[in-house]
Amino acid sequence: MIYMKLIKYLFYIFMLLGVTGVWAQKSDIRLGKLLNNGDWFTLEEEYPMIKDSVQTPMLRLMSEALLGYYFNRPDETITCVDSLLQHYQAELGLGNIASMLLVKSIVEANRGNYAVAADILKDFTSQLREQGVAMDYTQIDEAVQFYDRFRNCPPMSIELPQKNTVIAMSNDSIRLNIKNDTVQRGTSMYVSITVNSKQYKAIFDTGASTTFMSEAFAKKTGVRLIADSLQIHGGITVYGQSGILDSMQIGDIIVRNIPITINKDTTLNKVEDIDLSLIHI
């Protein structure tokens, strides 16, 4: 179970309660539209200009929580989610509460706090089940199981050099080692990485929620398996494995204890000149 882009059932929040004034109402509607559309880059650009005229505090907190998530401001996300859950549970409704808790658990897991991430969701579903609340628990239960498997693993850490460093990147088209293949698959960013003193080429995907390897490459680099029968949710749902890579070097930066998603699909092995499919640090 991996969230490739984040949560699928997001927030339908055109609940502009208590809005006064035409311009204030326009700001709330604009904010709600950007949230519902998942237009995070536009929201990041426009939010500083309209936030003071937004009349619905819940919308402001939700915007800041999700902007913090998508633009790597984890403290901001945690603070805003906690405030939302403390003050606006009735307005949020059960679906949005679940989504906000999933966001919080993902942030904690990204920090390496796997036990905290699992327990946030486990406590939530335990309370609902005790109360006999009927809902689809599948996604949350999968997240709990996933984070539980990493519960005793050390958190990922990054060792930075004492000086500024530049990491070389290149852009190139995606090609498969298939005879007479002419399909256009777009372009990706590529970086050079070092694992176990050997250099490899990797796709650098800023939207990936995990570092992603083929089964063959995971074995080659000595990834320690944590769990089998892992559901991987992307365009389709497939089954793979999860594990930990002890270390990886990118330029002068060393990353340790990296969570890895392993795809058993041999299609990954056909990507031309690529060893590591997706990297997320």
State each model region's role.
Residues 25-279:
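Pepsin/retropepsin-fold aspartyl endopeptidases
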Residues 1-31:
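Bacterial Sec-dependent N-terminal signal peptides
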